[in-house]
Amino acid sequence: MIKICTVYFEDDWSSYTPDYVGKLYRSLLKNSTIPFEFICISDTDVEADIVLPYNHYSDIKKHWHKLKYFSPHFANQKPGDEIIIMDIDQVITGNIDDLIGYPVLDNQFISYGTWWPRKIKVNGGFYKFKSGQFDYIWNDFALNPAYWQSHYYENGDVHYRYYGEQNYVNWKLYEKGVKVIETPKEWLGKYTDNKKDMVEMNKMYSKISNTDYMILDDVNEKIKVVHFNGVNNTIHKYKENFIEKYWG
C-alpha cells in the first residue's frame, strides 16, 4: 500500500486553509491511476482518507510533526508499505503515476530532483521510502525535539524559527551514509511572486529540461507538480490561469 502523508495546522504563523489538504487530495486522485491512502495529521476537519490528531500541546512544533511518519508504528503502517510525505503547498499539473509510483527498494530514500542552487540534497516537499527503514529519523528527533527544532535557525541555516525539518532529515541520511535518489528534475516546477526570480527560474528550468519555458500562461508539459514553498508564498493569493486550471 502507498500511503501519502501530510500535515495541516492552524496558528498565527500559517496562512494556509483546510482546503489546501482537500485540493491536494482531489488533485492526486484525479491525476493518478495508482491506489493510495491519503493521511493528514490535522487540528481541524480536512478532506482525507484518514485524519490523525495534531497536538498543539506537545513538544513538537508545526511541520516537524511530519517526522512521525518515519515511525513504523504511526498511521497504521504495515511492513512493505511505501510511505510518501508531501507538503500541502503544491499544485498537481499532470499525471503523477510516475511520481507516486517511483520505484523504491529497501533502504532507498527518494526526494524531488531540484534544479535551482541548494545546500542540501533532500527536498521536504516529497519524501518516499519503505515503512520503518528510516525510523531513526523519528527516534533520534524524539529524544530532543527542542534542540533540533531550534538548531538550524540558531546555526543560521534557515531564517525562521522552527524551520529546518528537511535540513534535519538531510543530516540524518548523510550521517548514516544513505544516498538520496532524485526524481527527474524536469518534473518539478516552482513559483513565486517575484517576477525577476521567475525570469531566472524559467531560464534555469529551460536549460535542464531542454525546453523553452517552465511556466508562462500554462505550465510546461514535462512538469507534474508546481511547489509554492517559502514563507507567505500561498497558492490562493495568485490569480494565474494555471492555478485556476489545476488546483483542486
Residue spans for each PLM region:
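A glycosyltransferase accessory/donor-loop signature
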Residues: 5-7, 13-15, 34, 40, ...
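Residues at alpha-helix caps and immediate loop-helix transition turns in enzyme cores, especially N-
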Residues: 16-20, 95-96, 239
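Amphipathic coiled-coil/heptad-repeat helices and related helical stalk/stem segments
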Residues: 21-24, 63-66, 92, 165
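Non-transmembrane alpha-helical segments in soluble domains
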Residues: 25, 29, 100, 166-174
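A structural signal for short, well-ordered beta-strand segments and their strand-loop junctions
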Residues: 39-41, 84-87, 92, 109-111, ...
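A generic structural signal for well-ordered coil/turn residues at beta-strand boundaries
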Residues: 122-123, 222
